[in-house]
C-alpha cells in the first residue's frame, strides 16, 4: 500500500543504525517505518532518488496492516525497503508550519499517564501508553552533551 509521509524525525541509534518517523497527513497519524529483518542504517537516507532529511515527503510501499504493533509502539509499520522515493521536500518555513499544525499540547497527550522512572529515565512499559511518537513545541529546552559526546534534551512542555 503506497503512502506518503512527511519525515518528522531521524534519530541516530547505536552503531550506524537509525530510526525515522513520519507523519501520514491522509491518515492523520505518525508512522515509524520498520524492516521485517534488521534495522534501518544510515545508508537508508541515501538509498533512493534523493537524500532523505527532515521535511522530505517520502513515498513508501507499506505492508498491511498499517500500524499493527502493540502499545506504546503502535506506529511501527513494515515496508518494502526497495519501494521508496522522495517526492518533494518542505522548505524550512513550510516544515515549521507543518510541525506547529500537528503539535501536541504536552507529553501526556502523546504517551498517556503510564510513564514510569527506570534508572532515573522516563519509560513507558510495554503494552502501556497511547503511542510513542509525537511533537511538542516546548516552552523551554536545554541540550546537554556529556563527557562521551552523547546529547540529551531536557524540556518543559
Residue ranges of each PLM-predicted region?
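N-terminal ordered "arm"
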Residues: 1-60
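OB-fold/S1-family single-stranded nucleic acid-binding modules
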Residues: 56, 61-157
